[in-house]
From Swiss-Prot:
GO terms for biological process: translation. One of its GO terms (cellular component) is cytosolic small ribosomal subunit. This is Small ribosomal subunit protein bS6. GO terms for molecular function: small ribosomal subunit rRNA binding; structural constituent of ribosome. PANTHER family: MITOCHONDRIAL 28S RIBOSOMAL PROTEIN S6 (PTHR21011), SMALL RIBOSOMAL SUBUNIT PROTEIN BS6M (PTHR21011:SF1). Belongs to the bacterial ribosomal protein bS6 family. Pfam families: Ribosomal_S6 (PF01250). It comes from the Bacteria. The lineage of its organism: Bacteria, Pseudomonadati, Pseudomonadota, Betaproteobacteria, Burkholderiales. NCBIfam families: S6 (TIGR00166). The keyword Ribonucleoprotein applies.
Amino acid sequence: MRHYEIVFIVHPDQSEQVPAMIERYKTTITTHGGQIHRVEDWGRRQLAYMIEKLAKAHYVCMNIECDQTTLDELEHAFKFNDAVLRHLIVKMKKAETGPSPMMKEVQREEAKKAAAAQPAEAQA
């Protein structure tokens, strides 16, 4: 089995469905004997360019290990899911299990927001 990194972008109006979508894709992978090494929900982010007149979308990254038939099934699911605006599947040499640079940035932003909220609460 080969290692893959999958990033897919979901329509911002469908953000509440993302956890269910991730669960569905994880189930597809595991039922066919694949493994999931990392799943990261990057949340709503600014797009580099407009897609279907949208400036923001919900990003999800998955690092998996699976065979070609499972990958074909996942790609088919991405193509025929109207909520998925774009998807990218990249073959990797080995499994990536640590946080991605994007996830580190998301965590830094959350830490900044928490730090900014703390002094505001202390003053009130």
